[in-house]
Amino acid sequence: MSGGTSGHRTVDAVVFDWGGTLTPWHTIDLREQWLHYAEVYDPAHADELSARILSAEDAAWRAGREHQRSATLDQIFRGVGVDVDSDRHRDGLAAYHRWWEPHTHTDPDVPPLLAGLRDRGIKVGVLSNTLSTREHHEAVFRRDGVLDLVDGAVYSSEIPWTKPHPHAFRAALDAVGVDDPARAVFVGDRPFDDIHGAKEAGLRAVLVPHSAIPDSQKGHVEGEPDAVVDRLGDVLAVVDRWNA
């Protein structure tokens, strides 16, 4: 574990990325997720439909990286002609979420880490670039027993921006009731979205460098973290040092 200096400022809030941070990184077959959906929604054209959804999803993520513009699953489905009000769509979406479930489990370090932060009077936040709804993410947190440990969360599917846009970080700070970004820390696994974005927005940043991020998902700038941790649970010691 390595860290930088804190100056005289204290930490009032710690905001976490979700995928690759609160839940460990998983390398997956992106086409397979949509085959599971399409085989329920339109079995006769599952290969074609899954390819179209994957292409639309890729375009949405690319717009997020290049222009910090958010998107939703609903927009993607509508864009490829899916009837989002149909029973077969709801059944397909359920199959999609079932496929994802093994890849969404919360890191075992998270419950004691979040509880430790809150015991110290530090607010806990989440800021995630996601296409999914708040309801989906809260169901994951509830399943893993950590929903009540989160004071505020912002999902890019609910706002116009994605990380690293400073407005996304501002929204996360507002969600946990912190005015001064210098009194907040962001923890994430992506040097561009998370570390560069947080630093540009005025937060301190902690990198958890465990994710095998594809080159196509890396941004053009890598931020310089204030600390790097070997495991998520080490964040508490970093915050304690900065608050000493």
Question: How would you describe each model-predicted region?
Answer:
Residues 1-16, 44, 111, 115-118, ...:
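Asp-based, Mg2+/Mn2+-dependent phosphohydrolase catalytic module
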